[in-house]
Swiss-Prot record:
<dbReference type="GO" id="GO:0019740">
    <property type="term" value="P:nitrogen utilization"/>
</dbReference>
<dbReference type="InterPro" id="IPR012349">
    <property type="entry name" value="Split_barrel_FMN-bd"/>
</dbReference>
<keyword id="KW-0285">Flavoprotein</keyword>
<dbReference type="InterPro" id="IPR050268">
    <property type="entry name" value="NADH-dep_flavin_reductase"/>
</dbReference>
<keyword id="KW-0520">NAD</keyword>
<dbReference type="GO" id="GO:0008752">
    <property type="term" value="F:FMN reductase [NAD(P)H] activity"/>
</dbReference>
<dbReference type="GO" id="GO:0042602">
    <property type="term" value="F:riboflavin reductase (NADPH) activity"/>
</dbReference>
<dbReference type="GO" id="GO:0006212">
    <property type="term" value="P:uracil catabolic process"/>
</dbReference>
<dbReference type="InterPro" id="IPR019917">
    <property type="entry name" value="RutF"/>
</dbReference>
<comment type="similarity">
    <text>Belongs to the non-flavoprotein flavin reductase family. RutF subfamily.</text>
</comment>
<dbReference type="InterPro" id="IPR002563">
    <property type="entry name" value="Flavin_Rdtase-like_dom"/>
</dbReference>
<protein>
    <recommendedName>
        <fullName>FMN reductase (NADH) RutF</fullName>
        <ecNumber>1.5.1.42</ecNumber>
    </recommendedName>
</protein>
<dbReference type="Pfam" id="PF01613">
    <property type="entry name" value="Flavin_Reduct"/>
</dbReference>
<keyword id="KW-0288">FMN</keyword>
<comment type="function">
    <text>Catalyzes the reduction of FMN to FMNH2 which is used to reduce pyrimidine by RutA via the Rut pathway.</text>
</comment>
<keyword id="KW-0560">Oxidoreductase</keyword>
<dbReference type="GO" id="GO:0010181">
    <property type="term" value="F:FMN binding"/>
</dbReference>
Amino acid sequence: MSTLDVQTFRDAMACVGAAVNIITTDGPAGQAGFTASAVCSVTDSPPTLLVCLNRGASVWPTFNENRTLCVNTLSAGQEPLSNLFGGKTPMADRFAAARWQTGETGCPRLEDALASFDCRISQVVSVGTHDILFCTIESITRHPAPQGLVWFDRGYHALLRPAC
């Protein structure tokens, strides 16, 4: 069996569209957040999702210690916020760029996110360079934004909500 090279894998994954999310935490280790597209549902009984986080990321120790997080799914027009949380911008500046509320777990919840999933990390599995965080959902908040936001082919794209 041949070993695939990293670039081939990344090029193929660029063909897989995914929602754009800002993952936040707050607790004993402090406040932190990052942009992620490696998020998906696991089961609805109990409601659980997963988030993949590189163990080499500057935010990893904070999430690892706090053991809570909020997945904030972005809507179209929130690309600048995604870029802030995806770069080297200081944490205080990231959070100052938007309006937040405190979720049930104490994590920051983006006021105008398409959906926010306030969670407790229930299990962590390490694979390669990343930890897979299995997250039990404590509460969900939805916003009636007209368009979703996805990352596809290395760029942002708006998704129109169908008219009812």
